Amino acid sequence: MRKNTIWNYSLIFFCCVLKSISTLDHGPHTVSVDSNRHNTQHQYKQNPNVASQRHSSHESGQSLHNSQSEHVTHIAASHAGSGGEHSTHLAQNLHRSSYNLLSEAMSQAVSNEFSSMGSGSADGACAADDFDCYSGSVQDRFGMEAIASLHRQLDDDDNGNIDLSESDDFLREELKYDSGYEKRQKAFHFNDDMHISVKELWEAWLRSEVHNWTIEQTTDWLAQSVQLPQYVDLFKLHKVTGAALPRLAVNNLQYVGNVLGIKDPIHKQKISLKAMDVVLFGPPRETGTRWKDYILVTLLLSAIIGCWYAYQQNKNAKRHLRRMAQDMEGLQRAEQSLQEMQKELERARMEQENVATEKLDLERRLKEAPTLSSSNSDLEVQQLKKEIEMLRNELSRAEFELVDNCWSPPPQLQSWLQYTYELESKNHQKKRTSAEKQLQSAREACEKLRKKRSSLVGAFVSTHGKSIDDVDRSIVEARNALGDVTNELQERLHRWKQIETCLGLNIVNNNGLPYLENVLYGRNGGLQSSMGMSSTKGSRARITNSTEDLDDESIQGKLNFENFSLLATE
């Protein structure tokens, strides 16, 4: 501010002297002064280093004032030599006009000084095209010089302005933008200003968001946009803010190399280009790195979720396989128990048939006893007598029991009950066959599933398919069918045991379903009568034995079915 004041005073006084000289003489002296003034201003414009040599004191300004006064006095003396009265009159007029002009100039300078201080203008009394004066009045002189250097770098035709084609060439050639730079170029040419001067570029830089960046924002830009995070600590150490980016943009060797200590030329060039971009065209554009990071994170999360889902499905499949294996083992045990029980039932039935056959043979032999020849041995006669005695005793006991009960079943009831038992046995056999088929199909499905699980593709398909659920459901259905067959067989044994106990008839041991159908529906009276007679005669003799056999069979069957039920429920 003090330098501006000195130069204002000097220029005003110099103008006053020129005006005074012009009033005295309009000859060659005026042309000489004007040419000297033009040469001085032209020298200031051509030599930008003059701005750095303007650190003069108030005494240098005063000496310049004295030298100019002596020059004016010398001119007045030269004119005074031309003679007498006219010289005295000119000297008085010169003294009076110089004093008036000097007073007016001083008052105008003071008013301009106060007006420039009040308005806060950055360039004060500098001319619009006087960059040296303008850079000398700003605080960030290095930043201003860097902005001017960038302006010269963009101004290809050296006309003092940056037009649209020059900025377009700079974006394409220097910053290597192939596309997507229209917004940044539009932001550079603010308000469609197609000709940008140094002053406008400096004012745009002062308004820029990048100019107000803090140290943290600058280091973030260095790490993310420039991708040189190794210099973050160095920037923090030297407190590099956004205002220092123009010096980085012009690749100031003193600042970048000596102050910051960055020696790698490739890194210097990279920092310079990125700094040019943000200084001239604003904050860096989105390069898509963040979106790539989002997509990468999303894909990573999807992969993790997919792996977790596959792991869960594999674990569930293994758990289903273990459960199916357990169910199959339970079904196998139930099947074995059922087969053993069926074998025991068949064995008991064969024993009952053998007993009945022996009884019939004994009765036949008793009937044929009178016709035996006397040649039979005494031993056989004794045995027959013993058997006859036993039969008589049992017959008498049965008659006694019938007399005590005072009720005897009808003759045909035994045949109908035997026929009913055979029908139930036939239906039970059908259900058992169906349950065995379900068991066999479940076993085959389980084997197929195990074969599929042996390969990777089959394991993936079986994991994501419905085959496991279908096999599991078929196993459960087979187990339920076996349970129903077991319960029904247990209930039948108990029920027919109670019926035989109450009636004293042999129902379980019979001559078979075809014979019973022939007897009951064939209308053969002889067979029916003989069946009735044999039943009345033999029933009393077989009541005790059949009851005891049914007791043993029911107890054994009950134990077997209890074991089978426990295996089936497992």
Swiss-Prot record:
How is this protein positioned relative to the membrane?
Single-pass type I membrane protein
- Give this protein's Gene Ontology molecular function annotations: calcium channel regulator activity; calcium ion binding; calcium-induced calcium release activity; store-operated calcium channel activity
Q: Which organism is it from?
A: Drosophila melanogaster
What cellular component GO annotations does this protein have?
endomembrane system; endoplasmic reticulum; endoplasmic reticulum membrane; endoplasmic reticulum-plasma membrane contact site; membrane; plasma membrane
Q: Which InterPro entries match?
A: SAM, SAM/pointed_sf, SOAR, STIM
Give residue spans, biased composition: Polar residues: 41-70
> Disordered: where is this region?
40-71
Tell me the superkingdom of the source. Answer: Eukaryota
Give the protein's function: Plays a role in mediating Ca(2+) influx following depletion of intracellular Ca(2+) stores.
Span of the signal peptide: 1-23
What name has this protein been given in UniProt?
Answer: Stromal interaction molecule homolog
Q: Where does Ca(2+) bind?
A: 155, 157, 159, 161, 166
Extracellular compartment ranges equal 24-294
Q: Which UniProt keywords apply?
A: Calcium, Calcium transport, Cell membrane, Coiled coil, Glycoprotein, Ion transport, Membrane, Metal-binding, Phosphoprotein, Signal, Transmembrane, Transmembrane helix, Transport
Answer whether the UniProt record assigns the keyword Acetylation to this protein: no
Q: Which residues form the EF-hand domain?
A: 142-177
